[in-house]
């Protein structure tokens, strides 16, 4: 069980400072924010208005549903062979990456006679997409959480205290901002391609251009617009060597502070609190 990390709660100014000088959190937040600007359409819109088979997802998702639990068992293997940075990127972008070949296959034949309208061909393509995606599902769920926890340890190492609350608020605001912009642009693009939601209800088909637009919005457009999120993570450098040094120093510091904190001496606690808040000022830039 982890000991109490700080005797005094950091001020708002100190909390903001701890986020600004926490490089791992900044990069992960920026990556998430840029990825959140992804513009795309709904898979269900494509199934309904292009393939005319709203329940196709129930069929294409069967193999992936079987693989899903086993994807968590594969995480240790991925950890041994790849860096956390690579796994974070691949876990976040694997869906878009796999949709690129789906788009290329669907484009065969053009807008009017393209395979993107063929339910059998696209059914197979979507099954492969969902199945391969599920292989990385465990990585997608576990690695970002691990890296977030490491970033909080980095915050403690760098500043002497942890600011999970302020960090969560900052990340949440960034994601909401990008989400609002993304939804607005997606709605605008649907209007641009002439998408009319009421046509399906009236039993009327969308035009070929609109159908292809819905297909592109579901496949290639999200991949293109979310790729910017990769750039910040290329500068993520909390690697094994730095983590080893960080945790070695943290363990020593925690042990010393725990000893002081359990002494029950008020003067010692005040001295400890002051020392914790001054760690960020004395720590060299990393």
Q: What kind of region is each of these model predictions?
A:
Residues 1-285:
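Membrane-embedded alpha-helical bundles of multi-pass transporters/translocases
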């Amino acid at each position: 069980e982890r000991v109490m990390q700080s005797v005094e709660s950091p001020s708002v100014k100190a909390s903001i400072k701890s986020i600004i000088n926490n490089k791992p959190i900044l990069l992960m937040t920026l990556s998430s924010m840029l990825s959140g600007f992804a513009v795309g359409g709904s898979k269900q819109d494509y199934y309904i208005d292009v393939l005319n088979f709203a329940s196709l997802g129930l069929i294409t998702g069967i193999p992936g549903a079987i693989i899903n639990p086993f994807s968590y068992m594969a995480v240790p293997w991925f950890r041994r062979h790849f860096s956390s940075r690579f796994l974070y990127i691949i876990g976040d972008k694997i869906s878009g990456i796999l949709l690129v070949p789906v788009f290329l296959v669907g484009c065969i034949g053009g807008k009017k006679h393209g395979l993107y309208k063929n339910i059998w061909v696209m059914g197979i393509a979507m099954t492969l997409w969902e199945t391969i995606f599920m292989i990385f599902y465990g990585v997608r769920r576990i690695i970002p959480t691990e890296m977030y926890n490491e970033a909080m340890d980095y915050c403690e190492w760098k500043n002497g205290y942890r600011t999970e609350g302020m960090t969560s608020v900052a990340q949440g605001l960034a994601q909401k901002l990008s989400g609002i912009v993304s939804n607005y642009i997606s709605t605008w693009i649907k209007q641009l391609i002439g998408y009319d939601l009421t046509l399906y209800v009236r039993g009327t088909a969308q035009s070929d251009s609109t159908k292809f637009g819905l297909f592109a919005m579901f496949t290639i457009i999200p991949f293109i617009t979310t790729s910017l999120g990769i750039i910040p993570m290329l500068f993520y450098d909390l690697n094994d060597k730095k983590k080893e040094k960080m945790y070695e120093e943290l363990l020593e510091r925690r042990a010393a502070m725990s000893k002081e904190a359990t002494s029950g001496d008020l003067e010692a606690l005040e001295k400890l609190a002051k020392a914790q808040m001054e760690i960020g000022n004395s720590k060299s830039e990393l």
